[in-house]
Amino acid sequence: MNKYIWLVRLWHSKEEPMFLRSVSSSFIFIHGVPRKLKTRTVFPTLCGTRRASFAAISVYISEDESFQEKRIDSVENRGIRPNHQTLKWLLEGCLKTNGSLDEGRKLHSQILKLGLDSNGCLSEKLFDFYLFKGDLYGAFKVFDEMPERTIFTWNKMIKELASRNLIGEVFGLFVRMVSENVTPNEGTFSGVLEACRGGSVAFDVVEQIHARILYQGLRDSTVVCNPLIDLYSRNGFVDLARRVFDGLRLKDHSSWVAMISGLSKNECEAEAIRLFCDMYVLGIMPTPYAFSSVLSACKKIESLEIGEQLHGLVLKLGFSSDTYVCNALVSLYFHLGNLISAEHIFSNMSQRDAVTYNTLINGLSQCGYGEKAMELFKRMHLDGLEPDSNTLASLVVACSADGTLFRGQQLHAYTTKLGFASNNKIEGALLNLYAKCADIETALDYFLETEVENVVLWNVMLVAYGLLDDLRNSFRIFRQMQIEEIVPNQYTYPSILKTCIRLGDLELGEQIHSQIIKTNFQLNAYVCSVLIDMYAKLGKLDTAWDILIRFAGKDVVSWTTMIAGYTQYNFDDKALTTFRQMLDRGIRSDEVGLTNAVSACAGLQALKEGQQIHAQACVSGFSSDLPFQNALVTLYSRCGKIEESYLAFEQTEAGDNIAWNALVSGFQQSGNNEEALRVFVRMNREGIDNNNFTFGSAVKAASETANMKQGKQVHAVITKTGYDSETEVCNALISMYAKCGSISDAEKQFLEVSTKNEVSWNAIINAYSKHGFGSEALDSFDQMIHSNVRPNHVTLVGVLSACSHIGLVDKGIAYFESMNSEYGLSPKPEHYVCVVDMLTRAGLLSRAKEFIQEMPIKPDALVWRTLLSACVVHKNMEIGEFAAHHLLELEPEDSATYVLLSNLYAVSKKWDARDLTRQKMKEKGVKKEPGQSWIEVKNSIHSFYVGDQNHPLADEIHEYFQDLTKRASEIGYVQDCFSLLNELQHEQKDPIIFIHSEKLAISFGLLSLPATVPINVMKNLRVCNDCHAWIKFVSKVSNREIIVRDAYRFHHFEGGACSCKDYW
């Protein structure tokens, strides 16, 4: 201490040597000024008029706030002429001690008086002081008058303007900076991007800034790229954000969090989760913010399995006590309906903040627990936490979910009392409350009372009218937005587009699309995905694809929406192709894409690829999602994998109707009709509710098995559950009775349909046609036209088939020619087949050949097969060989062609040619499908093959068959035996093995069934001439009705005649 006293004494002496002045100043610099000397009394005396010492002491006392005003006054009062160093330290003192704005202005005045305003260092200090005190005008004035500005000065000014959301000024300053040849650096772009994030900036401006960043070589700067990722993500350009992220060679925590958060917010949740996993695998420790973003993604895709895995990682890494992470977990569990886990986390939290309560209240509100949300709100009060706008908005949301309008009105009054009435969130929640409670008048009144500049409220009104399917008012609101110059955001256009989708208004949707293009929102991932969804659902798949390729980039939602569109319209091959292209571009599918890809595999019965997608879903964590499980049930059941179908079915939630329907439908479509019916019976036994889809599949299964008894049982359940008035179900029943051989029941069912549509008429017309009642089919067609029901392609198939079966060639040709002229229908291949069949049945083979050669489309195999079959009947070898030649070009391995050609040679007695044809079949490994017939006796299905001797009653059946044949021969039956004799001659086999299966089935039926029961037989091939003749005579000698359903139609035999009138 003595050294300081000595120094003071020297300063108080009247005659101090010059060298002591320099010594004392140096001493102060070295040792500093002790606190005891820092007093109001010592300071003025010590300073005297010595400028150098004053400046030196200023360095040490600048941290003492009590000296700020005193020392500045000393400068003015004592007439000291401070130098630039003194003023610099005084300014630093003002900054360190938070001096008043007036003090700084005094110093600024001194600087101007002394002409030191050109001093760059002083200008920087003054500039910093004004910025520190928030005097933007003073800072800008100093900035403009600076002789030279460093890059740091520019950056400070830009950041200050950005913090005040003065976007125009930021860009103006940036342009000025570049024009003055100042090279921007990381800090510059950071400030500019901050300004962009704070306001609405046109996309092309952001692109220009990005281009400048690349030009300056800052593509690897996290300082610049992290906010750029966030900016792109915030505005929905997640693909561009990902491009910036992928371009960073060294990514920091903020880079990962920005990208994960951006993906999560832009409905790329699956990609966000995968990116989080990549980050963890690379050894980068997740931050609470990273956990929050990825948990938010899990919440959006509703994946409890992934959420629980992340919860485990939270515990493992020691984040279980982090309030930020716990809040995200509570929100996740509440959203997924796991209230126990959410409340457990809440109760174990060491610290709960307002966000915690808000999260819990919001979770309860979203789950529909309005009462619990209100109780928690009261507890929040008891814990001394005040509600904020988020709390009150969540409580209003709870009222919206519960539909409790009265409580919502009370909250409305409460928010007004607390001064939150003009809060944007609460305004949106209240408006949504009135809209969802269908109080559209109050909603509109409230909307008009609010600050209509808030785009969120406009969006709510768009959604409100959309919920009412009021497209006119929805569009009116949209037009009013444009008049009021309300700038749309990424949710505005999707709101009205979704209404267009629901109402099927493509024209208005296209108008909205044009507005989207004008405002450059087509690059927004969310808008792009909704546009694709609209065009896909409304049938313009090519337009949807064009948008996907041009604008979607790597947005997984857009790609999976496109896949779903193809699946909806049964373009399963395109759906799978798109799915593969998505994977090839490095886009990992979400649960929507995987589900629709599996559905496409089911439609194509592509089992192997479906199993690969199943494995991919297991790896991705989506295999337990209910829609995916239902798609798996459909895949395996349609592919005939019964065991795998039930395994997938057992993984679904109990009682899920979609899974049950998938099982019934899948088995039915794969031909496992008995299994489909067993599942249907089990459904009813377990009390599972049926619907149109269930009954439709069950009825079709009964149709395919031609099991009249089971069909009637299904019909009984339909009647019991009240679905017998549903037109779709009734239509299926008409077809079922027709396929089971009961045309009378089909007629009865048709008459009971209250609202007949084109499917109803088609069902009865085709039923009459298949059963050989051509006149009735044509009468029904006339009634259909008179009922103002427009026919379609299916109708005309039934009409032309009816004309064919009853030999009305000219009338049939007239119907065919009227398809385009009267009904606007272009003939399809099946219509050409009907005409060829019509001509050939009438023996007009040459005319049929000419008709085929003049077809505007290439004849398919069925056309040529129809002609060849007729040539066998009419023994026309020339045209038959011509047809066979074309048929073998199309289907060289088809056994039916060789069989028909062999039969043609046989009926033409060209035995060598016949044998050569059969030899070719053997060489090519082509095998003829064996004939098989079925008949139901005493609730059991009995199956017979040609010459079958395996039945337990084979001897009795063959013996009875011989008796029937003898009796038929006595009244005129003559066996077509030349082919049989040739078989016997060449193959030297027992004649019994050439008895066709339908003859054995009929013999067994007549032997076993009561005399009053019709004989119902099914056959997999077409009935031959000999069998047809034999059955006609047997129906007469047995006095029984015999119904045979072959591969082409029904034959009703009774009294020695057939309903087909020998045209089959």
Swiss-Prot record:
Span list, region Type E motif: 863-938
PPR repeat ranges per the UniProt record: 83-118, 119-149, 150-184, 185-220, 221-251, 252-286, 287-321, 322-352, 353-387, 388-422, 423-453, 454-488, 489-523, 524-554, 555-589, 590-624, 625-655, 656-690, 691-725, 726-756, 757-791, 792-827, 828-858
Spans through the membrane: none
Cross-referenced InterPro entries: DYW_dom, E_motif, Eplus_motif, Pentatricopeptide_rpt, PPR_At4g14850-like_plant, TPR-like_helical_dom_sf
Claim: Cell membrane is one of the keywords in the record: no
Domain of life (superkingdom): Eukaryota
Keyword Acyltransferase listed: no
Sequence segments annotated as region (Type E(+) motif): 939-969
Matches recorded under Pfam families: DYW_deaminase (PF14432), E_motif (PF20431), Eplus_motif (PF20430), PPR (PF01535), PPR_2 (PF13041), PPR_3 (PF13812)
Type DYW motif: annotated span: 970-1064
Single annotated GO MF: RNA binding
Keywords assigned: Repeat
BP GO terms, sorted: RNA modification
Sequence similarity: Belongs to the PPR family. PCMP-H subfamily.
Name used for this protein in its record: Pentatricopeptide repeat-containing protein At4g13650
Native source species: Arabidopsis thaliana
Taxonomy of the source species: Eukaryota, Viridiplantae, Streptophyta, Embryophyta, Tracheophyta
Gene it is expressed from: PCMP-H42
